[in-house]
């Protein structure tokens, strides 16, 4: 009887060890809760992006945000697909026949994004993460990943940059 108990304990300890190893290897996609959780945050973020007056001061962004009414739903889908793929989920971000789904470098030059506009988007992203109670570790990784795209997206370096500060759980997050 003791041998069976000891063997069971060893099996449980081994499984617990493998479980903690597996969780240490979870992708950001898995830690965020998968496609539906990402879609929920992206839905909120895109709604905030489309009504932001600072972003809509850029004529190219305003034309997109206030032009074709289907562009918002399409952008939500494309952003979700991109985030899913970039965080280690399924490879679902694909180019389409309309020219969407390209790399960030190919898809943003015509928007003439400034550092300030990039900072506004980062601030809105951070607020979205807080809105949906994304963990601090995941927020750090998401914000670092987003910042890594600045040099690819920002082409208008003449505009003044905007730096915001948000705090959560005593941790200060700076968007720049």
Task: Pin down the residues of each PLM region.
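Bacterial N-terminal signal peptides
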Residues: 8-17
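Bacterial N-terminal signal peptides that target proteins for export
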Residues: 1-9
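N-terminal targeting/docking segments
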Residues: 3, 20-23
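Core of compact, soluble alpha-helical bundle domains
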Residues: 23-176
């Amino acid at each position: 009887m003791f041998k069976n108990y000891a063997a069971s304990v060893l099996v449980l300890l081994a499984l617990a060890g493998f479980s903690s190893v597996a969780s240490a290897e979870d992708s950001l996609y898995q830690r965020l809760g998968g496609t539906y959780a990402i879609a929920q945050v992206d839905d909120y973020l895109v709604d905030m992006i489309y009504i932001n007056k600072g972003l809509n001061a850029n004529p190219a962004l305003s034309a997109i945000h206030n032009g074709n009414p289907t562009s918002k739903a399409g952008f939500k889908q494309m952003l979700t697909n991109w985030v899913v793929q970039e965080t280690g989920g399924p490879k679902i971000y694909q180019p389409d026949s309309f020219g969407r789904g390209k790399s960030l470098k190919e898809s943003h030059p015509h928007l003439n994004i400034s550092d300030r506009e990039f900072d506004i988007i980062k601030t809105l992203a951070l607020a979205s993460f807080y809105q949906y109670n994304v963990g601090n570790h995941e927020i750090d990784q998401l914000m670092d990943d987003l910042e890594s795209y600045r040099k690819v997206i920002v082409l208008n370096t003449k505009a003044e940059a905007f730096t915001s500060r948000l705090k959560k759980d005593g941790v200060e997050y700076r968007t720049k």
